[in-house]
């Protein structure tokens, strides 16, 4: 049986234990002080990062956990996972709701609860392919920016002690709409830092996260389909466990208006094709590198069930707008690399006036209301703001 955690540690991150364990241990008293007995709301908590965040923070014993997600099956699996994890503390008051955080029913629930001490938002479009046309782009901006602003307005009624919203390396020097939306999200939450404490984190790929290329390797094997991966793109990776720990540390230990990122050197980058090679070897296969998708599909369809040779296709990346490299900060941002052994912190982040954000969001909503709104119009508006 393939142990995904061990595979990630041995073949992708090249560390069997989390790089954030020392910082968690060094700050355990403060983490417990800030979390124990507090109420916790996690939006998008059924996803890979959200669920990992929950498992990272539960040992510090919040009194209440409410999880929101549109994925009903994901919430069911989250509950099974929590209850099946040996020794994991689960609050006596634990509830999940399948709903959209932008819906009126969420507002009603939030107001009845009179807010939460800790709020973490992981609900976001995450794939660069989500920007292929005007419909996809509008959905991306609606979710990552406009709905997120409405959430912040709602939180202002009952300000949390800690608010965290996940970002991405794509927000540093954005070159695509996904990155632009996340950069705008960062600007937006910083504008609300006068109302309550806000923090965020930029980090890279989460190995085998839901919907990722690597998670797709497992699906392809299960369906006896060929594997495909770019061979010219190097990426930083963290494990699912580490992704939750980054967010937990930033959320609880960060000062108002700070952005966190993992300390990962370029030597930690790895290609997807290299991971694919290691994945097949771990499963006991030799790869057959095919020249085309059609050749690979044919080979997979015709190979016997007990074949130890598996078809792959490696290619040059063609995802429009994908960055050829990753960066967690840009010149001009003030860095603190001393506070944590595993995390860097961007301090004194510049803040736009909230009135400027309000005007921009009004412009976006007016643009989306036009019957002939085009992708180019949205891109122009984003560029003008940034």
Spans of model-derived segments:
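Helix N-cap at the beta1-alpha1 junction of Rossmann-like dinucleotide-binding domains, i.e.
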Residues: 69-74
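Strand-loop microenvironment adjacent to phosphate/nucleotide-handling motifs in alpha/beta enzyme folds
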Residues: 30, 189-386
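Conserved Rossmann-fold NAD(P)-dependent oxidoreductase catalytic core, especially the SDR/UDP-sugar
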Residues: 121, 125-142, 146-183, 191
């Amino acid at each position: 049986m393939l142990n995904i955690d061990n595979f990630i540690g041995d073949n992708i991150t090249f560390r069997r234990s989390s790089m954030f364990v020392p910082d968690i241990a060094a700050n355990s008293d403060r983490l417990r002080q800030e979390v124990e007995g507090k109420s916790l709301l996690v939006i998008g908590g059924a996803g890979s990062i959200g669920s990992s965040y929950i498992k990272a923070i539960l040992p510090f014993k919040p009194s209440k956990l409410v999880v929101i997600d549109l994925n009903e099956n994901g919430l069911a699996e989250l509950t099974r996972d929590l209850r099946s994890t040996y020794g994991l503390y689960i609050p006596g008051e634990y509830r999940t709701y399948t709903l959209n955080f932008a819906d009126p029913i969420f507002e009603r629930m939030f107001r009845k609860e009179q807010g939460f001490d800790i709020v973490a938002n992981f609900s976001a479009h995450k794939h660069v392919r989500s920007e292929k046309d005007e419909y996809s782009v509008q959905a991306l901006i609606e979710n990552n920016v406009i709905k997120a602003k409405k959430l912040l307005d709602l939180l202002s009624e009952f300000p949390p002690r800690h608010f965290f919203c996940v970002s991405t390396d794509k927000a540093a020097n954005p070159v695509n709409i996904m990155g632009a939306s996340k950069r705008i999200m960062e600007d937006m939450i910083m504008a609300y830092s006068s109302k309550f404490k806000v923090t965020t984190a930029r980090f890279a790929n989460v190995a085998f996260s839901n919907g990722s290329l690597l998670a797709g390797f497992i699906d392809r094997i299960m369906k006896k389909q060929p594997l495909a991966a770019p061979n010219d793109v190097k990426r930083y990776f963290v494990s699912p466990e580490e992704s939750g720990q980054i967010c937990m540390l930033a959320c609880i230990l960060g000062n108002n208006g700070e952005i966190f990122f993992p300390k990962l050197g370029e030597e930690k980058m790895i290609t997807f094709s290299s991971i694919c090679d290691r994945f097949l070897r771990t499963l006991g296969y030799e790869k057959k590198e095919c020249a085309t998708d059609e050749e690979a599909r044919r080979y997979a369809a015709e190979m016997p069930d007990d074949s130890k040779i598996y078809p792959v296709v490696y290619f040059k990346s063609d995802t429009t707008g994908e960055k050829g490299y990753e960066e967690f900060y840009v010149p001009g941002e003030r860095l603190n690399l001393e506070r944590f052994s595993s995390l860097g912190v961007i301090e004194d982040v510049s803040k736009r006036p909230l009135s400027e954000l309000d005007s921009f969001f009004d412009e976006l909503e007016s643009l989306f209301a036009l019957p002939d709104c085009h992708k180019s119009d949205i891109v122009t508006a984003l560029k003008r703001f940034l």
